[in-house]
Amino acid sequence: MKNENNNPRKSNIIGICVSQLQNHEVSGLTHTIYQCARANGYQVMVFGCFAKMDFPTPHSNGEASIFENIPMKDLKALILMGQTILHRELLLRLRDEAVAVGTPVITVDYELEKCFNIRLDYLSCFKRLVRHVIEGHHRHNPYFMAGFKGNAFSEERLDAFVEVLEENGMPVVQEHIAYGDFWGKPARRVCEQWMERTDDFPDAIICANDTMALAVIDVLEENGYHVPEDVIVTGFDGIELIKYCIPRLTTGRVDQEEIAEQIMHIVKRVETDPETAPQSVLVPFHILRGESCGCAPIHF
């Protein structure tokens, strides 16, 4: 990417724009990128805040002021943690300010034109996870707990569930699919309704994220069912909380170190050849086989 000022950039600083730093996964990834950058000889400036930016409020607007005076021309590269900010106009402004002074922009899990985009391959892993339950554990009556209706992540995972059912010649029963809105309380309500189906009980409940899966396990156990002996439960995302739950949840998780390494690879490539055209890099998710599917023995 060409430096519009035609001056060699002496700075060795990488900037990171991020929000929702109170989230353990967000702060963990930010720290992993920081450590990887330092190990590769770069300094790091983190422009971070805690508010959600997708629905602007006076409070979030105040926190967003951290992004107003970033020294773009002094940065080796700018990293936008787009899924933590979720304010498209703000992300576009930051991108344009960086590009205008020749600073390459790298996005994480949020695609923008004129940027190097680190994309996360949720779909392939989620399909493998569904196949693991149906084909690996031979479950014949799986239910699916989606997130928000219409949400891209939720609908993509629902489509994956349906696709794997059809691959295995299994019927898609709409009554076996419900929306838990990615949160614990809505997921509990849905699962409590499922508990009333004595004549059509699931032998597996596949959830679109870990938070809902943990709520489902709680409801099952409160109603006298054992996980995974009676019902297999799986989640997705690999949140920190699953480390402290019994049974340990089977889920999918991205390798944060791989994200950081891909970012460093891009930074070094652009450093060597400033005319490198922006492109996308796909980082895979991996299945973490835990206790909730029966792959690992339960330890108390």
Predicted feature descriptions by range:
Residues 39-42, 165-172, 197-200, 222-227:
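Short helix-capping segments at alpha-helix termini
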Residues 140-141, 172-176, 227-232:
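Short acidic capping loops at alpha-helix termini that bridge into adjacent secondary structure
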Residues 35-36, 75-76, 188, 297-300:
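PLP-dependent class I/II
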Residues 190-300:
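Flexible loop/turn connectors
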